A protein has these predicted regions:
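Short, basic/aromatic beta-hairpin or loop at an interaction surface
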Residues: 1-14
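Charged, cofactor-coupling segments
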Residues: 18-91
């Protein structure tokens, strides 16, 4: 994932992996995306020449989903989650 502010893709970079309590410190007011990848094969990925598209190095099938999250004084808010709890259109 990535930070979101005045422009769409900003720091910090939010990695697809990590160890608990070793990453970025988050605090109220931060807004960023979480973009997990689920791969049929290994976790290794590469970015294509367009600078955007991520593919698995072993060419296995992969799916990616994105949520935009805001950190609040009391926790977090998922901005891209359906208010009605729907998982498919109409949201």
């Amino acid at each position: 994932g990535h930070g979101i502010s005045n422009t769409f893709h900003e720091l910090p970079n939010i990695l697809h992996y990590g160890k608990k309590n070793t990453g970025l410190e988050i605090y109220p007011g931060m807004t960023f995306t979480i973009e997990p990848m689920i791969n049929a094969g290994k976790y290794n990925v590469k970015i294509l020449n367009d600078g955007w598209t991520a593919v698995t190095k072993d060419k296995s099938l992969s799916a990616q989903f994105e949520h935009t999250v805001g950190i609040t004084e009391n926790g977090y808010e998922i901005f891209t989650e359906s208010v009605k709890g729907y998982t498919k259109p109409p949201y």
